[in-house]
């Protein structure tokens, strides 16, 4: 019901009629499913804003495959170990068309080590081979986003934001 949507704190009326670049609204979504029967599933949570938990699934699968290899082979369980590669490909596909190089610079923006999903942030950035940055590592110059590095500023093409909306504004310390 629309009343439920309108009462949500994350509902932003200014987004009505907003058209994002290339009409890509949500390139990454997390959906938690619960199997309740042979052919019955329920959505426990769907998260478009900051999905998390995939690193635990990947680590769990790796351990389970080592412990029970026959179980996976016999039941033809699909592999998931290519998730970081596919995630990186998705992120790179979001780079602006006027990218300076053929390989876009992608970073993962984390709120820091106190965040409950920090392990996942480090895991994913490591698996994708990208830099993990915090807000203090970034600056804007001539309408372009840069990260500070030991070799000097490096332009960023894509930010994989793992930080909630309310923590984005550095002037509003929530």
List the predicted regions and their residue ranges.
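Domain-scale recognition of functional cores that engage charged ligands
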Residues: 1-174
